[in-house]
């Protein structure tokens, strides 16, 4: 039970966000020459798995995203594999420990070739997204195409998506692209916050 005491309320304040930023800086931010999943060449890179796979990073990221869940009154949270999976897993666990559980799903890039062959994973046999408000999340937003793919799949099965969120926004077009599809992007952190202090 002692571990539970360390989980702060959703409105955890600027201190936790500052701590999260430093974890991202230490574990996930890199300078170099990289080709991003969008095909764009960049001299900065965010590999968010090391942040999301360490306990404190996962907790703090989940708390920031859960603020957005409350703001937009989402009933479900989901995103595209692989980047969103650690995020939504942490959100499910932390929200339950706070007695404010949020249901989560993830969208496969390609349907499984066996079993249920579902594109959307996480729903029970009698559960669907028809008419449900879904917040789409991702670890990093660049062009916004990965987030948009998840949005399209959720909307295809009747989910309502008006908002998306990312842990780090590279500010390279995601906000504008999603706005064209009626979606507001909420960003926890921005790439400029890391470049300016390097």
UniProtKB/Swiss-Prot annotation:
The keyword Transferase applies. Orotate binds at residues 142, 170. 5-phospho-alpha-D-ribose 1-diphosphate binds at residues 108-109, 112, 114, 138-146. Pathway: Pyrimidine metabolism; UMP biosynthesis via de novo pathway; UMP from orotate: step 1/2. Its EC number is 2.4.2.10. GO terms for biological process: 'de novo' UMP biosynthetic process; pyrimidine nucleobase biosynthetic process. Keywords: Glycosyltransferase, Magnesium, Pyrimidine biosynthesis, Transferase. Its cofactor is Mg(2+). It is an enzyme of class 2 (transferase). It catalyses: orotidine 5'-phosphate + diphosphate = orotate + 5-phospho-alpha-D-ribose 1-diphosphate. GO terms for molecular function: magnesium ion binding; orotate phosphoribosyltransferase activity. The keyword Calcium does not apply. InterPro entries: OPRT, Or_phspho_trans_dom, PRibTrfase_dom, PRTase-like. Catalyzes the transfer of a ribosyl phosphate group from 5-phosphoribose 1-diphosphate to orotate, leading to the formation of orotidine monophosphate (OMP). NCBIfam families: pyrE. Homodimer. Belongs to the purine/pyrimidine phosphoribosyltransferase family. PyrE subfamily. This is Orotate phosphoribosyltransferase 1.
């Amino acid at each position: 039970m002692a571990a539970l005491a360390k989980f702060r309320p959703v409105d955890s304040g600027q201190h936790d966000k500052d701590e999260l930023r430093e974890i991202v800086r230490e574990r996930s931010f890199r300078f170099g020459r990289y080709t991003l999943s969008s095909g764009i060449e960049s001299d900065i890179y965010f590999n968010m798995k090391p942040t999301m796979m360490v306990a404190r990073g996962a907790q703090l990221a989940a708390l920031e995203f859960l603020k957005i869940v409350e703001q937009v009154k989402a009933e479900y949270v989901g995103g595209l594999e692989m980047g969103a999976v650690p995020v939504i897993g942490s959100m499910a666990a932390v929200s339950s420990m706070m007695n404010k559980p949020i249901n989560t799903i993830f969208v496969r890039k390609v349907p499984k070739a066996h079993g249920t062959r579902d594109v959307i994973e996480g729903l029970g046999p009698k559960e669907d997204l028809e008419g449900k408000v879904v917040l789409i999340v991702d670890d990093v937003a660049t062009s916004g195409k990965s987030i948009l793919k998840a949005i399209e799949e959720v909307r295809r099965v009747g989910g309502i998506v008006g908002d998306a969120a990312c842990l780090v926004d590279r500010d390279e077009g995601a906000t504008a692209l999603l706005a064209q599809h009626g979606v507001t992007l909420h960003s926890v952190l921005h790439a400029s916050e890391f470049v300016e202090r390097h």
